[in-house]
């Protein structure tokens, strides 16, 4: 839930229908099914893997986790103090998707919460329309996104621990 595009649809399947140039990788259509109008890389894909993997490029996953723990140690106390509030967490991450994922582009992507396409060729060809915007994830976006993703991972770790600890208390 703490990956922002898992908490929003936006008429583009949570960024799956938003082709982006990621650093030096141009978006390419699916070679087996170009009629689907889905491209790689896309916004959801880079938030799922590329941003975090690039951010931890200089370290291994354990060291990266330790770095996040250290970086967000002060904030983690307030996350714990707030208790388990799953609905609030979902809205918090949804708002993060709007402000820190979509609004971070110079070419604006409108927020369309009520449109739920089945694929990228739906919603008046959302995949093709987004492709024509030529959106680019540059170093500045990558840097901001890495901070957002890192915070989301730290929050998710603390909150998952809270849920598991509560479950362990309930089922000795």
Residue ranges and their predicted role:
Residues 4-172:
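C-terminal accessory segments of proteins
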């Amino acid at each position: 839930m703490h990956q922002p595009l898992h908490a929003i649809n936006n008429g583009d399947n949570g960024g799956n229908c938003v082709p982006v140039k990621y650093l030096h990788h141009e978006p390419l259509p699916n070679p087996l099914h170009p009629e689907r109008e889905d491209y790689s890389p896309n916004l959801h894909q880079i938030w799922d893997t590329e941003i975090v993997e690039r951010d931890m490029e200089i370290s291994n996953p354990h060291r990266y986790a330790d770095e996040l723990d250290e970086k967000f140690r002060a904030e983690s106390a307030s996350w714990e103090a707030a208790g388990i509030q799953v609905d609030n967490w979902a809205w918090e991450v949804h708002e993060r998707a709007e402000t820190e994922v979509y609004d971070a582009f110079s070419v604006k992507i409108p927020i369309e919460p009520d449109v739920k396409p089945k694929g990228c060729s739906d919603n008046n060809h959302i995949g093709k329309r987004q492709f024509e915007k030529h959106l680019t994830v540059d170093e500045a976006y990558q840097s901001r996104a890495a901070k957002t993703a890192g915070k989301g991972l730290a929050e998710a770790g603390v909150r998952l621990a809270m849920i598991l600890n509560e479950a362990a208390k309930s089922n000795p």
